[in-house]
Amino acid sequence: MMAQRNSGAPDNAGGSNDGREGGRGRRDNRDDRRGGRDNAEKSNYLERVVTINRVSKVVKGGRRFSFTALVIVGDGHGLVGVGYGKAKEVPAAIAKGVDEARKNFFRVPLIGGTITHPVQGEDSAGVVMLRPASAGTGVIAGGAARAVLECAGVHDILAKSLGSDNAINVVHATVAALKQLQRPEEVAARRGLPIEDVAPAGMLRARAEFAAAAAQGGSHG
């Protein structure tokens, strides 16, 4: 009788271990699937790290170092955001910047890969002027402004920095300019005029061609 009880104990213990291992395996699989969905969602966006700085704070025991990262995130189709992350390690600072940028998303009105009208944005000492450009011009802009424009999906534009060359100021001035953009319909409604009186004929023609091309591509798909 004793032998039977002793021989049965290890079998039960082994079964409980198998159950625990199976539970851990199922949890790991769920985490892997959840991580895969998160990675797929993040991969749909363009990310640009504009600048990384090391900052120090004097404390009682000496200096404490950390890193800051200025990050631009966009979908390349008119949606863009800017984030600023701070952490003890560079990857963590970038990750925080990405999360903040996605919380700050805003929509940029575009027509055929360029902006709807000239605009100038200011933030602190940064001043950035943006002008529409014809197809094939490309993004004529400095590094900091270029990162914002490319993530927003602008393909043809003329940009010039008129103020501070500090990357943070340039980025925020570029964002301020983009947030001032309006669609021709909005301008026409505000002025109480037909859209043909407030938008150049070339812009309206380009918008019509772009819409027709998009509709044709959708029908083939």
Curated annotation (Swiss-Prot):
GO biological process: translation
SUPFAM superfamilies: dsRNA-binding domain-like (SSF54768), Ribosomal protein S5 domain 2-like (SSF54211)
Region (Disordered): 1-40
Biased composition (Basic and acidic residues): 18-40
GO MF term set: rRNA binding; structural constituent of ribosome
Alphabetized UniProt keyword annotations: Ribonucleoprotein, Ribosomal protein, RNA-binding, rRNA-binding
Known partners and oligomeric status: Part of the 30S ribosomal subunit. Contacts proteins S4 and S8.
Family the entry assigns: Belongs to the universal ribosomal protein uS5 family.
Function: With S4 and S12 plays an important role in translational accuracy. Located at the back of the 30S subunit body where it stabilizes the conformation of the head with respect to the body.
Domain statement: The N-terminal domain interacts with the head of the 30S subunit; the C-terminal domain interacts with the body and contacts protein S4. The interaction surface between S4 and S5 is involved in control of translational fidelity.
NCBIfam families named among the record's database cross-references: rpsE_bact
PANTHER family reported for this sequence: MITOCHONDRIAL RIBOSOMAL PROTEIN S5 (PTHR48277:SF1)
Protein name per the record: Small ribosomal subunit protein uS5
Species of provenance: Mycobacteroides abscessus (strain ATCC 19977 / DSM 44196 / CCUG 20993 / CIP 104536 / JCM 13569 / NCTC 13031 / TMC 1543 / L948) (Mycobacterium abscessus)
Gene: rpsE
